[in-house]
Curated annotation (Swiss-Prot):
<comment type="subunit">
    <text>Homodimer or homotetramer.</text>
</comment>
<dbReference type="GO" id="GO:0004766">
    <property type="term" value="F:spermidine synthase activity"/>
</dbReference>
<feature type="binding site">
    <location>
        <position position="162"/>
    </location>
    <ligand>
        <name>S-methyl-5'-thioadenosine</name>
    </ligand>
</feature>
<feature type="binding site">
    <location>
        <position position="86"/>
    </location>
    <ligand>
        <name>spermidine</name>
    </ligand>
</feature>
<dbReference type="InterPro" id="IPR030374">
    <property type="entry name" value="PABS"/>
</dbReference>
<dbReference type="InterPro" id="IPR035246">
    <property type="entry name" value="Spermidine_synt_N"/>
</dbReference>
<protein>
    <recommendedName>
        <fullName>Polyamine aminopropyltransferase</fullName>
        <ecNumber>2.5.1.16</ecNumber>
    </recommendedName>
</protein>
<comment type="pathway">
    <text>Amine and polyamine biosynthesis; spermidine biosynthesis; spermidine from putrescine: step 1/1.</text>
</comment>
<dbReference type="InterPro" id="IPR001045">
    <property type="entry name" value="Spermi_synthase"/>
</dbReference>
<keyword id="KW-0808">Transferase</keyword>
<dbReference type="Pfam" id="PF17284">
    <property type="entry name" value="Spermine_synt_N"/>
</dbReference>
<dbReference type="InterPro" id="IPR030373">
    <property type="entry name" value="PABS_CS"/>
</dbReference>
<comment type="similarity">
    <text>Belongs to the spermidine/spermine synthase family.</text>
</comment>
<dbReference type="Pfam" id="PF01564">
    <property type="entry name" value="Spermine_synth"/>
</dbReference>
<keyword id="KW-0745">Spermidine biosynthesis</keyword>
<feature type="binding site">
    <location>
        <position position="31"/>
    </location>
    <ligand>
        <name>S-methyl-5'-thioadenosine</name>
    </ligand>
</feature>
<feature type="binding site">
    <location>
        <begin position="155"/>
        <end position="158"/>
    </location>
    <ligand>
        <name>spermidine</name>
    </ligand>
</feature>
Length: 284
C-alpha cells in the first residue's frame, strides 16, 4: 500500500508527496508538528499541515533570505531572526565570521527540538555560541529594542496562527526602531500566483512602504511552496538592494552557496510585469 501526504495549498490546488515513513507527529502549545520521510524531497516538516521545510529544497529559501541582505552590507554585525525554528537561517548567517551575534526568537520550542532531532544538517548552528535562542513571541521581544540590529530577518510562518502578529504595521514600526542607521529588514512575502497569498504580499509591502524609505521585492523558485514561485521583501533605512550591492566584497568571501550568487541577486529584483502591477496598484 502506498502512503501519500497531500498539502492543500488553496481550495482548488494540492501538492502530494509519496511517503516512506511518518516519523513524528505531536501537538505543541501553538501548532501541530509533523515530520515525514518522502521519496523525492527527503525529510520534510509540516506545521498545521503546511510544509515548512524539506531537505531537498531548503537551501533555496535560506540562501535568499540571508545572502541577499548580507551582500548589500557585508559589515553586518548584529542580527535578529524572528521565527526560523528549523535553524537554516542561523546556519547561513554563521558562515559570516564578521557577524558578532544573532538573537533568534522562536515562539515554539518544539519546532527547534524537532529540527535538532530530524534535520541535523539544517539545525547545525543552533548551539553556536554566537547564537542566543529565545522561546518567546517575536512581537513582544522587539518592542523595547532601539538601534540594536544591523539586520532583522522575519523568517515566519504565514500570516495566520502564531505568525499573524508578524505582519502588522505596529510590528514593522518596532522593527524600524530596532534597526541601526544602515539597517535592513528582510521577510518572506508569500506568492503572487494564488489570490489569497498575493493579497498578503501586497499588504505586507504596502505596510513596509509607510515606514521604510527603501522597499523592494525579490523572488525565488521554491518547488514545495505554494505555486513554486515565492517573494521576499527587502526594506532598509538607507541601502538599496541593487544599487548598493557589494558584489566584489561578497564574492571574495568564497562562501560556495548552492543557490545564491551576485548575478542572481540582481535578477531576483527584476520582477515579472504582473507582479510589479500587483505591488504598485495593490490589486490582485
Amino acid at each position: 500500500m502506498e502512503l501519500w501526504y497531500t498539502e492543500e495549498q488553496t481550495q482548488h490546488v494540492r501538492l502530494s508527496f509519496k511517503v516512506k515513513e511518518h516519523l513524528f507527529s505531536e501537538q505543541s502549545e501553538f501548532q501541530k508538528v509533523d515530520v515525514l520521510d518522502t521519496y523525492e524531497f527527503g525529510k520534510l516538516m509540516t506545521l498545521d499541515g503546511l510544509v515548512m521545510v524539506t531537505e531537498k529544497d531548503e537551501f533555496i529559501y535560506h540562501d535568499m533570505i540571508v545572502h541577499v541582505p548580507m551582500a548589500v552590507n557585508p559589515n553586518i554585525k548584529n542580527v535578529l531572526i524572528i521565527g526560523g525554528g528549523d535553524g537554516g537561517t542561523a546556519r547561513e548567517l554563521m558562515r559570516y565570521q564578521s557577524i558578532k551575534h544573532v538573537d533568534m526568537v522562536e515562539i515554539d520550542k518544539m519546532v527547534c527540538d524537532v529540527a535538532r532531532d530530524y534535520f541535523p544538517t539544517i539545525s547545525s548552528e543552533l548551539e553556536n555560541p554566537r547564537v542566543s535562542l529565545y522561546y518567546e513571541d517575536g512581537v513582544a521581544f522587539i518592542k523595547d529594542k532601539e538601534n540594536k540590529y544591523d539586520l532583522i530577518i522575519i523568517d515566519s510562518t504565514d500570516p495566520v496562527g502564531p505568525g499573524e502578529g508578524l505582519f502588522s504595521q505596529e510590528f514593522y514600526t518596532n522593527c524600524f526602531k530596532a534597526l541601526t542607521e544602515q539597517g535592513i529588514l528582510v521577510n518572506q512575502n508569500e506568492s503572487p500566483v494564488y489570490e489569497q497569498f498575493a493579497r498578503e504580499a501586497i499588504r505586507a509591502n504596502s505596510k513596509l512602504k509607510k515606514i521604510f524609505p527603501i522597499v523592494e521585492v525579490y523572488q525565488a523558485q521554491i518547488p514545495t511552496y505554494p505555486s513554486g514561485y515565492w517573494l521576499f521583501g527587502f526594506a532598509s533605512k538607507s541601502l538599496h538592494p541593487v544599487k548598493d550591492l557589494k558584489s566584489s566584497v561578497w564574492n571574495q568571501l568564497n562562501l560556495n552557496t548552492k543557490y545564491y550568487n551576485t548575478q542572481l541577486h540582481v535578477g531576483a529584483f527584476a520582477l515579472p510585469s504582473y507582479v510589479k502591477e500587483q505591488i504598485e496598484n495593490g490589486n490582485v
